């Protein structure tokens, strides 16, 4: 009963979290895949006319003119970022920028990969508990469900030692980050281990560039989770970023779900108070071990595991660097020449100014950089 699915009346971004862990939002094809996917490489991108968020055609030139002095956070009306947004920046920052500017261009091949990966994640989650659908109609309801999940998962972890799909949220350089940890469990030695599942189309481990992205992702999960259990995340910060109305009454479906879980609440504020109290009193430890498990999609065979060494200074430095783009203090950057092979499977290769300019971003694409305060 720990995880839910929202009605279409509430967008995925309204909740702050996805239904499944965000580990499968983005899957990049290997270099070998690129060599076999000429149709994908040559597929026309949004180079001439694309559909905007209001479903009206927009030309690339008009899109470029829309880039002004607003920061990406302001321009895209973002209240927070997903962990995978920063993980994608680790792969190619410019791809992240194009994805926000021109959404909806995911190639069919990649969409199929995501569907398969999500199915495997769902099957794993169902091994531990059933799913309950709770209809919601407001962003407050959606966040209430996530708070309820946290309240239910914390005692389950302490009593049974194993949970999946744990929501996390916290600040990084003044920006709210949200995500969902795939799995948490205690080892035989009593250490808290984070396990992240990654599915592979081919029966082989990923290239180092992909591993680098994955390692940063799980490190960021630990960075946020540890801050939550150490009391470094505050209700005031969450309210400031999300603009949630704590006094708004919860919907009837959410209230029923709360009562079934043993919680007598009326508003989001009631739940938020319980969540932060639970994080404080549960005596949850910080995460001791970070593990990534790679499995083959077709056969479910484990291809290998990676134990990630958490380097807090390095994580902080990367977060600071990536947030500088989102806050408008610098231009988005493409990949280095040595990693230009990534462009072979990029949906935006045909319009990429970085690629066309051999690593120099066109002034028509780059927003005016704000000076860091």
Curated annotation (Swiss-Prot):
GO terms for molecular function: 4 iron, 4 sulfur cluster binding; DNA binding; metal ion binding; single-stranded DNA 3'-5' DNA exonuclease activity; single-stranded DNA 5'-3' DNA exonuclease activity. Changing residue 196 to A: Nearly abolishes exonuclease activity. Mg(2+) binds at residues 182, 196. Changing residue 172 to V: Does not affect exonuclease activity. The keyword Heme does not apply. It comes from the Eukaryota. Its EC number is 3.1.-.-. Gene3D superfamilies: 3.90.320.10. Changing residue 343 to A: Abolishes iron-sulfur-binding and affects exonuclease activity. Its cofactor is [4Fe-4S] cluster; Mg(2+). Keywords: 4Fe-4S, Cytoplasm, DNA damage, DNA repair, DNA-binding, Exonuclease, Hydrolase, Iron, Iron-sulfur, Magnesium, Metal-binding, Nuclease, Nucleus. It is an enzyme of class 3 (hydrolase). Binds 1 [4Fe-4S] cluster. Changing residue 346 to A: Abolishes iron-sulfur-binding and affects exonuclease activity. GO terms for cellular component: cytosol; nucleoplasm; nucleus. [4Fe-4S] cluster binds at residues 92, 343, 346, 352. Pfam families: Exo5 (PF09810). It is found in: Nucleus; Cytoplasm, Cytosol. InterPro entries: EXOV, PDDEXK-like_dom_sf. Single-stranded DNA (ssDNA) bidirectional exonuclease involved in DNA repair. Probably involved in DNA repair following ultraviolet (UV) irradiation and interstrand cross-links (ICLs) damage. Has both 5'-3' and 3'-5' exonuclease activities with a strong preference for 5'-ends. Acts as a sliding exonuclease that loads at ssDNA ends and then slides along the ssDNA prior to cutting; however the sliding and the 3'-5' exonuclease activities are abolished upon binding to the replication protein A (RPA) complex that enforces 5'-directionality activity. Belongs to the EXO5 family. Monomer; monomeric form has weak exonuclease activity. Homodimer; homodimeric form is unsure but has much higher exonuclease activity, suggesting that it could homodimerize upon DNA-binding. Interacts with the replication protein A (RPA) complex. This is Exonuclease V. It comes from Homo sapiens.
């Amino acid at each position: 009963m720990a995880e839910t699915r929202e009605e279409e009346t509430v967008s995925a971004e309204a909740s702050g979290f996805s239904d499944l862990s965000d580990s499968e939002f983005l899957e990049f094809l290997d270099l070998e895949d690129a060599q076999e996917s000429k149709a994908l490489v040559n597929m026309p991108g949004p180079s001439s006319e694309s559909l905007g968020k209001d479903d009206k055609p927009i030309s690339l030139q008009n899109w470029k003119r829309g880039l002004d002095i607003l920061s990406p956070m302001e321009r895209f009306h973002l209240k927070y970022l997903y962990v995978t947004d920063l993980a994608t920046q680790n792969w190619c920052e410019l791809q992240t920028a194009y994805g926000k500017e021109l959404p909806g261009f995911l190639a069919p091949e990649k969409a199929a990969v995501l569907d398969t990966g999500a199915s495997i994640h769902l099957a794993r989650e169902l091994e531990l508990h059933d799913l309950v659908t709770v209809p919601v109609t407001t962003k407050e309801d959606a966040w209430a469900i996530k708070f309820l999940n946290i309240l239910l998962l914390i005692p389950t972890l302490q009593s049974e030692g194993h949970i999946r799909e744990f929501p996390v949220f916290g600040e990084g350089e003044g920006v709210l980050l949200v995500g969902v940890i795939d799995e948490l469990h205690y080892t035989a030695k009593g250490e808290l281990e984070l396990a992240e599942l990654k599915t592979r189309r081919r029966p082989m481990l990923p290239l180092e560039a992909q591993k680098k992205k994955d390692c940063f992702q799980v490190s960021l999960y630990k960075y946020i989770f540890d801050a939550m259990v150490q009391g470094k995340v505050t209700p005031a910060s969450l309210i400031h970023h999300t603009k949630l109305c704590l006094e708004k009454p919860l919907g009837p479906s959410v209230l029923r779900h709360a009562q079934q879980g043993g919680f007598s609440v009326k508003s989001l504020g009631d739940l938020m108070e319980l969540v932060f109290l639970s994080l404080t009193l549960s005596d949850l430890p910080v995460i001791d071990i970070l593990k990534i498990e790679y499995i083959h999609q077709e056969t479910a065979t484990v291809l290998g595991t990676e134990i990630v060494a958490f380097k807090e200074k390095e994580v902080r430095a990367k977060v600071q660097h990536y947030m500088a783009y989102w806050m408008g203090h610098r231009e988005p950057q493409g990949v280095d020449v040595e990693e230009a092979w990534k462009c072979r499977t990029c949906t935006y290769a045909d319009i990429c100014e970085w690629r066309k300019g051999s690593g120099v971003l066109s002034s028509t694409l780059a927003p005016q950089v704000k000076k860091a305060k």
